[in-house]
Amino acid sequence: MEPFRIHKGTAAVLMNNNIDTDQIIPKQYLKRIERTGFGKFLFDEWRYDNERHENPNFPLNAPDRKGASILITGDNFGCGSSREHAPWALADYGFRVIIAGGFADIFYMNCMKNGMLPIVMDKEMREKLAKTDAREQIEVDLENEVITTSTHRFHFTIEKMWKEKLLNGLDEISITMQYEQEIKEYERRIAVY
């Protein structure tokens, strides 16, 4: 996993509350286990009409929001079933940071495990951040837990364990591999039955 220290990017705004994992990526696209290729199906039923033409009224389809890597959204983001495909779709689309009023617990952990930073922020702060010009680069500094725009500076908090994993680009496998020598020594010592 790539370390996450400072991210600079533009933001897309989708302030709906209770966006569930089926709205993030509909179930018909979950027939694969690869982590890539899901971005084109992100918010599929909102982004496209029945003939797969972009819905011009959907915020992510606005020309000045294309290529955004920060998503500012409502409360309880990622609720519903615990499909890891939802964070995969967000990451594959290009999002590195999701800022919401809150997250479903499993979705929150899945974001972290996939190298994305989910940030919990109150509504007033999110509304200020959402007013940032669509072309402005927003800086998200994980180490100092600060989001900076040209006019505002917002502080956020993150659990130390998750912060360290993201800063160092560690997933479960790489953490396990830090103990490779100890594991080999243990395997050498145990009796074989």
UniProtKB/Swiss-Prot annotation:
> Does this entry carry the keyword Lyase?
yes
**A cellular-component GO term for this protein:** 3-isopropylmalate dehydratase complex
Q: What is its EC number?
A: 4.2.1.33
Q: What class of enzyme is it?
A: lyase
Q: Which UniProt keywords apply?
A: Amino-acid biosynthesis, Branched-chain amino acid biosynthesis, Leucine biosynthesis, Lyase
Which pairs of positions does the record mark as disulfide bonds? Answer: none
Name the chemical reaction catalysed here: (2R,3S)-3-isopropylmalate = (2S)-2-isopropylmalate
Q: Does the keyword Magnesium apply?
A: no
**Any idea what this protein is called?**
3-isopropylmalate dehydratase small subunit
